[in-house]
Curated annotation (Swiss-Prot):
Presence of the UniProt keyword Methyltransferase in the record: no
Gene that this sequence comes from: gatA
UniProt-listed GO biological process terms: translation
One cellular component term from this protein's GO annotations in UniProt: glutamyl-tRNA(Gln) amidotransferase complex
Active-site residues from the entry: K79, S154, S178
Protein name stated in the entry: Glutamyl-tRNA(Gln) amidotransferase subunit A
Length: 492
């Protein structure tokens, strides 16, 4: 039995039944990391000793007959922009290469309360700015389904780790699709919660009005378990919503009869990959056969979502990243002439090309003479995008679309063309602009590469998305497929 291939809820059954120990499970995943990390490159930092200590502590609790939380003993990976006390939080950037946070993010505290086994920190696009994990300052993570292709981004390391079996569950962050798009590319489940449902305390900020932490898991049941663990109000995060969190597993009902599903026509353009379109429409047929009502709808301001996002997100990033100046922490350029020269050289050498591009774009949008013409106008159109969703949800319970316009692309195919790269998130970023929940679920394969479908819900309707995803997975087995086994050696 390959423990690293199982779901968290199945592993819990084995742990409680004493059929396997937490230490055995931890070693199984660590051995798997040894096998595949040479080709997948999912981890920036691995904490073997810490993971084994955590697993041993869970085994002692089991031996003493104590009741354990639902995720006790489950190996987790954490995206490297989420603070974990004692381990580096680099954001895959040279400018933070040596920064070790002295505190845990709220979500990490919650995972520790669950007695999970935290394996380490996963690779990402630098400061979460990217859609392929090629913008990491360290190395490019590779897709377990085809190492010549990207895993998506910016949470590519987390998605690849879950898909490859080098983690059972993982946390990522989603600013414009950074959980859902890699989930689609790697054939796993990814949830972007409603803005404010999960605390951002301890998440290194990219765009503060858009960022959300969420889970990447093997199936929808695991997703619900992780959501139960990480959601909830946090007084340390001013954007955290003081709302009672339901038991998300209560929504795992195999019944979609009477559910009203909207298909936004703007998310099915003529340019959509034919294979992706076919997979999504096959998924639609599954819901129709099970008694759901499906109808086309319109989100007319969708065409403005990409330019609006690439004004608002870089503007917020240019402000958030101003704190990295070489003075307090992170990279400091040596042999500078004066303080101003140190600021300039440290930032120039410490940030990668994509981060500098977005800082410049955001600074321009916020500058005198352009603020009203660009940034303020983008905020107004953002409101129109939100209203489109509100009108759609007056008629529909959920919206369904492709998660991404294509399958995972070849490494290097888009690095010279930023616009082509930005279009990878064309179906996901409006969800962040509107602050809505979105979830990607594996729906099939095109030429051996995974394709995800996206469910979009009303604010705080994560339960509806989980219900849809769970029912779909009761009728399909796409989520049970695993990447083909290939040699685990280094790839140049």
């Amino acid at each position: 039995m390959r423990l690293y291939d199982l779901t968290a809820h199945r592993l819990r059954e084995l742990l409680l039944g004493r059929e396997v120990s937490a230490a055995e499970l931890c070693r199984s995943v660590l051995n798997r990391i040894d096998e595949v990390e040479g080709r997948v490159k999912a981890y920036v930092t691995l904490d073997r000793e810490g993971a084994l200590r955590q697993a041993a502590a869970v085994d002692r609790e089991l031996q003493n007959g104590r009741e354990l939380p639902p995720l006790a003993g489950i190996p987790f990976a954490i995206k490297d922009n989420i603070c974990l006390r004692g381990l580096p939080a680099t954001c895959s950037s040279k400018i933070l290469h040596n920064w070790v946070p002295p505190y845990d993010a709220t979500v990490v505290e919650k995972l520790k309360d669950q007695q999970t086994v935290i394996l380490g920190k996963t690779n990402m696009d630098e400061f979460a700015m990217g859609s392929s994990t090629e913008h990491s300052a360290f190395f490019t993570t590779r897709n377990p389904w085809d190492p010549k292709r990207v895993p998506g981004g910016s949470s590519g390391g987390s998605a690849a780790a879950v898909a490859a079996g080098s983690a059972i569950c993982a946390l990522g962050s989603d600013t414009g699709g950074s959980i859902r798009q890699p989930a689609s590319f790697c054939g796993v489940v990814g949830m972007k919660p409603t803005y404010g449902l999960v605390s951002r305390y301890g998440l290194v900020a990219f765009a503060s009005s858009l960022d959300q932490i969420g889970p990447l898991t093997r199936d929808v049941t695991d997703c619900a378990l992780v959501m139960n663990a990480i959601c909830g109000h946090d007084h340390r995060d001013s954007t955290s919503v003081p709302k009672e969190v339901p038991d998300f597993t209560s929504f795992l009902v195999d019944d979609v009869k009477g559910m009203r599903i909207g298909l936004p026509r703007e998310y099915f353009p003529a340019e959509l990959d034919d294979g992706v379109r076919r997979i999504v429409m096959e998924a639609v047929s599954v819901f129709e056969e099970r008694g759901a009502y499906v109808e086309e709808t319109s989100l007319p301001h969708t065409e403005y979502a990409l330019p609006v996002y690439y004004l608002i997100a870089p503007a917020e990033a240019s402000s958030n990243l101003a704190r990295y100046d070489g003075v307090r922490y992170g990279y400091r350029a040596p042999e500078c002439e004066d303080v101003l020269d140190m600021f300039r050289v440290s930032r120039s050498r410490g940030f990668g090309a994509e981060v500098k591009r977005r800082i410049m774009l955001g600074t321009y949008a916020l500058s005198a003479g352009y603020y009203d013409a660009y940034y303020l106008k983008a905020l107004k159109v953002r409101t129109l995008i939100r209203r489109d969703f509100e009108e759609a949800f007056e008629k529909f319970d959920v919206l369904l679309s492709p998660t991404a316009p294509e399958t995972a692309f070849i490494i290097g195919a888009k690095t010279e063309d930023p616009i082509r790269m930005y279009l990878s998130d064309i179906f996901t970023l409006a969800v962040n602009l509107a602050g809505l929940p979105g979830m990607s679920v594996p729906a099939g394969f095109v030429a051996g590469l995974p394709v995800g479908i996206q469910f979009i819900g009303k604010p705080f309707a994560e339960g509806t998305l989980l219900r849809m995803g769970y029912a779909f997975q009761q009728s399909t087995d796409h989520h049970r497929q695993r990447p083909p086994e290939t040699p685990g050696g280094e790839i140049s």
